[in-house]
């Protein structure tokens, strides 16, 4: 993914978070990924790491309409997924 794409996605996420009144940490730890698939508009995610521990993580996640997060696993890690705005569809199998 190009650095310009990463910067655009971070700006878009920041604008969304701020427009909904969510205060970001002073120096956010951003993760921007296309999951190695080369198509960040379809498969991507923008995250701010708020807490990272061996068995727990807390992240503020930003996605967009029609965006898919591919199936993945975490060995012994708890995640709470809370949709603060918009709609979230989770498929389990």
Q: What spans do the regions from the language model cover?
A:
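Short histidine-centered beta-strand/loop micro-motifs
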Residues: 48-52, 59-61, 69-74, 82
